Amino acid sequence: LGLIGIQISRPNILKTFISEKYMIEVELKFPVASIEEIRSHLQSLGAISEGVSIQADEYFNDPKRNYAKLDIAVRIRQSDDEFWLTFKGPNLDPAAKIRKEIEMPLKDALAAEQMRGVLAGMGLVSVAKVMKRREEFVGCDDLSCVHFCLDEVAEVGGFVELELVVESQEGVEPAKLKLIALADQLGLSGSTRTSYLEMLLESRESTLADSPTGPRENQQE
């Protein structure tokens, strides 16, 4: 089934706001041709819909450091009327995708705009905004709950993410096996660890290269 992405999720490093407990998120992501087909499969397996949200993920970069080369990410996410600041650290494993994730809720749109000002004051610039429609399902057994995200990403395509959170490293391997089995049941194959931001920028670069005028010089991503 390809590569398996593993992310370590940790609440915000600012102890004032969020606790210090670590979580390990095991994730598989697959491109799909038909979201509707996967939705039907999930419903037949008994997964429960948690609703639909429209998400806008705005990513930022420090031009002097180049976050892409450092393999880190800073973003502000708007999910309907909720806002979050997220930092994703570099991959911690050469074979699997293991990342530290630090996330802090922002009170409202004004707080999100103020945070953009803070990031700008630190020298960060907006790179791109990833827009997607996300429909979430959850399926639980006696041991755990698996979250399924059906994503329709603007300029990129359709994807399904399978996510399972465990509390210790010992739970990672069983979680991977469980997700692989579920992916088989859903008929999914060809998993990817490429982020939506990377896909979006690659798509835009390809479109620009194919345009009659070709790529513009010194374009800032």
Regions found by a protein language model. Give the residues of each.
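A generic structural motif
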Residues: 165-170
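Short, flexible, solvent-exposed loop/turn segments with mixed acidic/basic and small polar residues
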Residues: 15-21, 90-94, 148-156
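N-terminal strand-loop-strand beta-hairpin
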Residues: 21-143, 180, 186-221
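Acidic (Asp/Glu-rich), glycine- and aromatic
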Residues: 173-182
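Charged, well-structured binding/catalytic surfaces in domain cores that contact anionic ligands
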Residues: 134-158
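N-terminal amphipathic/basic-hydrophobic helices that include classical n-h-c signal peptides
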Residues: 1-22, 215, 219-220
